[in-house]
A protein has these predicted regions:
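Conserved anion-binding
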Residues: 21-22, 84-169, 173-178, 183-191, ...
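C-terminal helical cap(s) of enzyme catalytic domains, especially alpha/beta-barrels
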Residues: 115-119, 231-256
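Conserved, mostly hydrophobic/aromatic
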Residues: 27, 51, 81, 104, ...
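N-terminal amphipathic alpha-helix/helix-capping segment at the start of soluble metabolic enzymes
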Residues: 2-39, 178, 182-185, 204, ...
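Short, acidic/polar
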Residues: 32-43, 86-94, 151-160, 208-216
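Glycine-rich phosphate-binding active-site loops on the catalytic face of alpha/beta enzymes
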Residues: 101-112, 207-240
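Structural motif
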Residues: 46, 99, 165, 220-221
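Conserved beta-strand positions in the central sheet of alpha/beta enzyme cores
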Residues: 26, 49-52, 77, 105, ...
């Protein structure tokens, strides 16, 4: 595994993610510019819990993107959102397993058989996270897609199916965290993208709809929070990261008081 530190009570495919501060932060390395990718790896890797390599970087460079991130990261999150027939996804998981990543995403919509095949292929060496409802989908869009009951109902359903089929956790928007954590206690992991630090508005090109602050996501049950655009292209990444750390520490202090 790519982990530099671990939890003695955790499974082999788990990294230590508890506590306040930046251990629970996943930085999304979403770029196809190599200089930016390498710079982000070097800066964020030693400072946060996990680096995430997604489709943009992986399609551009393939496994070398993982190797670049691993040189700096405590843990690696490969975000490919695999979604195909069970045999094909199982083969892809076996290939990803050899890349020495800690987390790998699949789509919950692939169904129990696909998730179970992926879990068997993972063989405890990578934590499978089932993606539920993507954060750019708002309620009107879900209605147009003929998904009755809205995002919360579907996320809860898919999370239950994913856990029963062997997934280590799910990816969901911050808005579903509280209900999902009540229904699915730890060690089942909840990973929340759509994180916007306090004071960071939705800028031009921000296509995520179901969002929340980092502190709110942690307070309502997230184990990991995924942040990309508020951090990586920031004019002063160090200041942006310090502000995020302060937000999380203030929230943790308030929870203790």
């Amino acid at each position: 595994m790519s982990t530099k530190g671990g939890d003695p009570g955790a499974s082999e495919a788990t990294v230590a993610i508890g506590g306040s501060g930046l251990n629970q932060v996943v930085v999304a390395l979403d770029t196809n510019e190599r200089d930016s990718f390498e710079r982000w790896c070097a800066f964020f890797g030693p400072r946060v819990g996990v680096l995430k390599v997604g489709l943009e970087a992986y399609v551009r460079w393939g496994p070398p993107a993982i190797e670049s991130a691993r040189r700096h990261a405590r843990a690696i999150f490969l975000d490919l959102k695999l979604h195909d027939i069970p045999n094909t996804v199982a083969g892809a998981v076996r290939s990803a397993r050899e890349l020495d990543v800690d987390y790998l995403t699949i789509h919950a919509a692939g169904g129990p058989a696909m998730i179970a095949a992926a879990a068997e292929a993972a063989d405890g060496r990578v934590a499978l996270l089932a993606v539920t409802v993507l954060t750019h989908l708002d309620e009107p869009t879900l209605e147009r897609l003929d998904m009755p009951g809205g995002s919360a109902r579907r996320v809860l359903l898919w999370a239950h199916l994913a856990r029963a089929a062997g997934a280590a956790g799910v990816v969901c928007s911050p808005l579903e965290l509280a209900a999902l954590r009540a229904a699915e206690p730890r060690p089942f992991r909840l990973v929340a993208p759509g994180i916007r630090p306090a004071g960071h508005g939705s800028g031009a090109g921000d296509d995520q709809r179901r969002t929340a602050t980092a502190a709110a996501a942690i307070a309502t049950g997230a184990d990991l929070i995924v942040i990309g655009r508020p951090l990586t292209p920031a004019p002063d990444p160090e200041a942006a990261l310090a502000a995020l750390a302060s937000e999380l520490e203030d929230s943790a202090r308030s929870a203790r008081d």
